[in-house]
């Protein structure tokens, strides 16, 4: 059994393909999937998918609800209430995707911090874990998280791609680490491959971030280059190789960690 903690199933690339994608995921041993909310509308779409496919795929889909740093300029006084209402749905297991992204600054750093801090407050009020994004903003994000750490119930750094120093800084805050197909990339993933063994197994979770970040150790690569949850096993395989631990151990431990972190059935 595997759990994919981050899938963008409401993405247009999956339109009219959701049932097939979920069927292939089950065939590949992926029994639970957490859909990522990145805006109010995408969070609603994620929750709607959980409802739509509950009868056909019982207790397989869950969701996060939040506003991604790219969308932070959409934050207003109604956003908090909207996310709180969405978070009351039984399938919602975390607040996010939230955090800071100073790589592209599609929203200004100030706008990002306002939305981030508000979602930290929401997670504290609801005592729900955080699903965090961070790109080229580790120092500021760590400062904010350190300030709020005592009130945060739990948090996972989704799609970690940072260096060893940043990894240890997050681990020092007792945060969890999500690993995607980035680790399978023979060009961009070399640093992550070297430090993956430094993540305690009980702090590690796996995710595809589908349809993005297709694992490059798939042979042959699918012609459409579209990632999906069924390919989670390739990420586990790569982690296994670089940690020098069996795929069975990686699968068992990451699943146990995700079940506990998200309080899944």
Label each region the model flagged:
Residues 1-265:
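Mid-domain alpha/beta scaffold segments of enzyme catalytic cores
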């Amino acid at each position: 059994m595997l759990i994919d903690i981050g899938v963008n199933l409401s993405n247009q690339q999956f339109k009219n393909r959701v049932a097939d994608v979920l069927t292939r995921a089950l065939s590949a041993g992926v029994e639970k999937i957490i859909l990522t909310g990145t805006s109010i509308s995408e969070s609603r779409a994620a929750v709607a998918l959980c409802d739509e496919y509950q009868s056909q795929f019982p207790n397989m889909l869950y969701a996060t609800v939040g506003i991604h740093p790219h969308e932070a300029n959409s934050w207003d006084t109604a956003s908090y209430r909207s996310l709180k209402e969405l978070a009351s749905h039984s399938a919602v297991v975390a607040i996010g995707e939230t955090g800071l992204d100073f790589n592209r600054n599609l929203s200004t750093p100030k706008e990002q911090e306002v939305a981030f801090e508000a979602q930290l407050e929401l997670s504290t009020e609801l005592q729900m874990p955080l699903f965090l994004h961070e790109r080229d903003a580790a120092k500021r994000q760590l400062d904010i998280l350190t300030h709020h750490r005592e009130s945060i119930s739990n948090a996972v750094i989704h799609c970690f791609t940072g260096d060893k120093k940043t990894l240890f800084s997050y681990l020092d805050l007792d945060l969890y680490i999500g690993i995607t197909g980035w680790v399978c990339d023979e060009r961009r993933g070399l640093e992550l491959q070297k430090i993956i063994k430094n993540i305690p197994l009980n702090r590690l979770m796996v995710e595809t971030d589908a349809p993005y970040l297709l694992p490059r150790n798939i042979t042959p690569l699918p012609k459409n280059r579209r990632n999906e949850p069924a390919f989670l096993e390739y990420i586990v395989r790569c982690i296994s190789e670089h940690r020098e631990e069996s795929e069975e151990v990686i699968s068992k431990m990451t699943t146990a960690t995700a079940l506990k972190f998200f309080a899944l059935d």
